[in-house]
């Protein structure tokens, strides 16, 4: 069972937080709400639809952080001759994903921007 202020779907509990934070702070906030809680992840279109239905009345047309980013899986790059990549001439861009609450369209955003978010844990 989900706590009283959380919504239930397919054995998972969800809660919308209309307190804009950056991605890392939102993820940390989620982990502090309940054991096993993280920013929402979608395993099916039905689950995504449920979250859209849940968030729309609270946030209207808005964006919410979801639990996808490239913050922790930067690849170890090396040159084709095997030497390490010590010199970088490109701008490092850390991207995190938001979901549009009206239609679940995913958009990449700068991880330091602030948005509302949805936390989820397995009941």
Swiss-Prot record:
Compartments (UniProt record): Secreted
C-type lectin domain: residues covered: 1-123
A Pfam family: Lectin_C
Domain of life: Eukaryota
Keyword Secreted: yes
GO molecular function, one term: toxin activity
Cellular component GO terms, alphabetical: extracellular region
InterPro entries: C-type_lectin-like (IPR001304), C-type_lectin-like/link_sf (IPR016186), C-type_lectin/snaclec_domain (IPR050111), C-type_lectin_CS (IPR018378), CTDL_fold (IPR016187)
Keyword Heme: no
Chief localization: secreted
Annotated disulfide bonds: 2-13, 30-119, 96-111
Tissue-level expression: Expressed by the venom gland.
Alphabetical keyword list: Disulfide bond, Hemostasis impairing toxin, Platelet aggregation activating toxin, Secreted, Toxin
Family: Belongs to the snaclec family.
Free-text function comment from the UniProt entry: Potent platelet activator that aggregates platelets via both GPIbalpha (GP1BA) and GPVI (GP6). Induces a tyrosine phosphorylation profile in platelets that resembles this produced by collagen, involving the time dependent tyrosine phosphorylation of Fc receptor gamma chain (FCGR1A), phospholipase Cgamma2 (PLCG2), and LAT.
Assembly description: Heterotetramer of the subunits alpha, alpha', beta and beta'; disulfide-linked.
Name by which UniProt lists this protein: Snaclec alboaggregin-A subunit beta'
Organism: Trimeresurus albolabris
Higher taxonomy: Eukaryota, Metazoa, Chordata, Craniata, Vertebrata
């Amino acid at each position: 069972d989900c706590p009283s202020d959380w919504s239930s779907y397919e054995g998972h509990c969800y809660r919308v937080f209309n307190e804009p934070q950056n991605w890392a702070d939102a993820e940390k906030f989620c982990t502090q709400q309940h054991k096993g809680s993280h920013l929402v992840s979608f395993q099916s279109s039905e689950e995504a639809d449920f979250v859209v239905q849940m968030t729309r009345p609270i946030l209207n047309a808005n964006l919410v952080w979801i639990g996808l980013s490239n913050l922790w899986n930067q690849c170890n790059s090396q040159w084709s001759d095997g030497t390490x990549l010590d010199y970088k001439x490109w701008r490092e861009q850390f991207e995190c994903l938001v979901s549009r609450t009206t239609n679940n369209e995913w958009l990449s955003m700068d991880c330091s921007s602030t948005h509302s978010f949805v936390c989820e844990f397995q009941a």
